[in-house]
């Protein structure tokens, strides 16, 4: 297959990176404000003069996978002629190991022709504070003391555990590419490869990639593998597209109709899969699909065990248990003993719990407003106001209607609504 096209066509310069002008400007402005960089580069790209840009000790590039976070850093290092020291934080996890690798890289002399060194910590959100002893603390320490530019990348840096990194970094958000921008890149690659690609075929690849340029390029290379020089819509239909977004009805249908355990488990790999929503739907659809009492009981037994895992995950933040919960909730529910032959069409009902929550949303919002008012004015916690004070007010309101009127004026809602809340 040769060199991966993701690497072959990786942008070599800032100007070749599409749709990330704001991110490029912020990154260049930070480099030029704190470190030595070519004058022509700074004159072209460094347009931001804000205090927080110059004072940040590092840059944290944020955004979904495949939009060019790592590519931006590679292009920056090439533009300013810095040697790039790249580490994948999810591979080198312990603090001791991180310090050793970075320290060794910084102590070694730069190769001939480089003006300095730039450190890239890729995928810092791959660190798990509980498991990766000292990894996050080591990165923070390096950022605080390093005399060289440090850039980090993360898909989601807004997890509370990354607060220490965010506090000392300039967070730069990269945008997801539009379908048209992905198509333009794919079109250029087809031309460079001497391949004749139908426009609709490229649009189909771009649409299914959901703005992930890396995924789109990998898909294009897969479709044109084996020396093929043409690509049509029929080719894509024949081979199959990237996993589409699935509705919950489609998720349930795939799980219940799965012939093997792994086939049901694979549903969780779909980008649209929401395990919390799935669990609510599964609880109500099991008796619809499995009419036999013993079969339904077996499915509910797997769901109850999965619920035990989920409860522990939420209480203890032990997310490493999630795969086991999903195996029980998906494969376990699908592969029950005496599984019946399913009809061509199954009518899955919307979970009543979600319907009730939707219907009561406004009432719950008003009740929370009442709780907030009581907590602030009585100088008590919201939980105490919710569990005790509301019931006291309810008893008082039954004896004295003026209590309802006073609360109505304070909250700005009519007296009937206040009475209903109590």
Curated annotation (Swiss-Prot):
ATP binds at residues 63-70. One of its GO terms (biological process) is DNA replication. Pfam families: AAA (PF00004), RCF1-5-like_lid (PF21960). GO terms for molecular function: ATP binding; ATP hydrolysis activity; DNA clamp loader activity. Keywords: ATP-binding, DNA replication, Nucleotide-binding. It comes from the Archaea. SUPFAM superfamilies: P-loop containing nucleoside triphosphate hydrolases. Gene3D superfamilies: 1.10.8.60, P-loop containing nucleotide triphosphate hydrolases (3.40.50.300). InterPro entries: AAA+_ATPase, ATPase_AAA_core, P-loop_NTPase, Rep_factor-C_lsu, RFC_lid. NCBIfam families: PRK04195.1-5. Part of the RFC clamp loader complex which loads the PCNA sliding clamp onto DNA. Heteromultimer composed of small subunits (RfcS) and large subunits (RfcL). Belongs to the activator 1 small subunits family. RfcL subfamily. This is Replication factor C large subunit. The lineage of its organism: Archaea, Thermoproteota, Thermoprotei, Thermoproteales, Thermoproteaceae.
């Amino acid at each position: 297959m040769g060199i991966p096209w993701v690497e072959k066509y990786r942008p070599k310069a800032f100007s070749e990176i599409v749709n990330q002008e704001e991110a490029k400007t912020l990154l260049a402005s930070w480099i030029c404000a704190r470190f030595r960089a070519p004058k022509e580069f700074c004159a072209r790209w460094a347009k931001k003069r804000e205090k927080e840009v110059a004072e940040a000790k590092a840059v944290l590039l944020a955004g979904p996978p495949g939009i060019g976070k790592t590519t931006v850093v590679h292009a920056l290092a090439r533009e300013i002629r810095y040697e790039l020291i790249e580490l994948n934080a999810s591979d080198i996890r312990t603090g001791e190991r991180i310090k050793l690798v970075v320290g060794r890289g910084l102590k070694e002399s730069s190769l001939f022709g480089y003006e300095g060194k730039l450190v890239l910590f890729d995928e810092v959100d791959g660190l798990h504070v509980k498991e990766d002893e000292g990894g996050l603390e080591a990165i923070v320490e390096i950022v605080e003391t390093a005399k060289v530019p440090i850039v980090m990348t993360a898909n989601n840096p807004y997890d509370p555990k990354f607060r220490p990194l965010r506090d000392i970094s300039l967070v730069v958000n990269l945008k997801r590419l539009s379908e048209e921008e992905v198509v333009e890149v794919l079109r250029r690659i087809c031309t460079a490869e001497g391949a004749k690609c139908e426009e609709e075929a490229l649009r189909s690849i771009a649409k299914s990639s959901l703005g992930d340029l890396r995924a789109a390029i990998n898909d294009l290379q897969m479709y044109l593998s084996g020396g093929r020089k043409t690509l049509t819509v029929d080719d894509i239909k024949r081979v199959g597209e990237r996993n589409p977004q699935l509705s919950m009805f489609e998720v349930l249908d795939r799980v219940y109709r799965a012939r093997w355990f792994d086939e049901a488990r694979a549903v969780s790999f779909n980008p649209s899969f929401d395990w919390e929503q799935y669990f609510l739907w599964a609880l109500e659809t099991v008796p619809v699909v499995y009419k036999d009492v013993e079969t339904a009981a077996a499915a509910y037994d797997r769901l109850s065990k999965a619920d035990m895992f989920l409860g522990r995950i939420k209480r203890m933040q032990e997310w490493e248990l999630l795969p086991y919960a999903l195996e029980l909730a998906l494969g376990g529910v699908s592969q029950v003993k005496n599984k019946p032959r399913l009809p061509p069409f199954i009518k899955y009902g919307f979970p009543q719990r979600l319907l009730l929550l939707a219907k009561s949303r406004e009432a719950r919002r008003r009740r929370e407003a009442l709780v907030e008012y009581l907590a602030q004015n009585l100088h008590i916690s919201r939980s105490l106001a919710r569990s005790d004070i509301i019931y006291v007010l309810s008893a008082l309101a039954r004896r004295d209607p003026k209590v309802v009127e006073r609360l109505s004026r304070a909250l700005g809602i009519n007296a009937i609504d206040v009475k209903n809340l109590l």
